[in-house]
């Protein structure tokens, strides 16, 4: 089925848009962008050069995907932002592309990024994660699958979070978090196992 694209959206003619997408008025899509099938792009979304998006994604108002990295080392290299399939990316989210030539910022499949989340350059998030309201993930982090970040979590640069970890609200951490643990506090401490996943 052909995509439904508002004539009030600003889309570079070089951008590749899949089938059965709906793009609302005032969306902004640059030329070096690929969007798969069955995606919904709401008003005032900006999708920048280097973004490669799979199928079934829904992007809400005022989100920016593929923004220039907030990194003093960035010198204009050609880099990418990879978004997988069936992600739900809510309002006011910012996802930065990578810093160095050939680099990628990656969001996998079936993730839920709530309002105001930020994913910085070169970070890689696997599948089925939740980023709570206002959660900020700094550059070069690695996040496993089925991780839940509660509201207003701050993940400092180069941290790694294992599969199915649960991070409590307001946690600020710079060290690695093992799989299947509940972590919280500043400084971060471990508060047991994620029994919801393990049961």
Give the predicted meaning of each segment.
Residues 187, 191-199:
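SDR active-site lid
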């Amino acid at each position: 089925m052909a995509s439904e694209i508002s004539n009030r959206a600003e889309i570079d003619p070089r951008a590749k848009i899949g089938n059965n997408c709906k793009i609302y008025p005032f969306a902004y899509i640059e030329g070096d962008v690929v969007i798969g099938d069955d995606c919904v792009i709401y008003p005032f979304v900006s999708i920048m050069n280097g973004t490669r998006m799979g199928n079934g994604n829904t992007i809400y108002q005022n989100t920016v995907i593929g923004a220039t990295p907030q990194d003093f080392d960035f010198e204009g290299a050609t880099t990418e932002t990879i978004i997988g399939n069936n992600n739900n990316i809510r309002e006011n989210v910012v996802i930065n592309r990578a810093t160095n030539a050939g680099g990628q910022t990656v969001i996998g499949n079936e993730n839920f990024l709530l309002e105001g989340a930020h994913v910085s350059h070169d970070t890689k998030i696997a599948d089925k994660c939740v980023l709570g309201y206002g959660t900020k993930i700094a550059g070069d982090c690695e996040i496993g699958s089925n991780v839940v970040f509660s509201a207003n979590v701050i993940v400092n640069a180069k941290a790694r979070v294992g599969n199915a970890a649960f991070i409590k609200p307001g946690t600020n951490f710079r060290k690695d978090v093992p799989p299947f643990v509940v972590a919280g506090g500043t400084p971060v401490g471990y508060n047991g196992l994620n029994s919801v996943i393990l049961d």
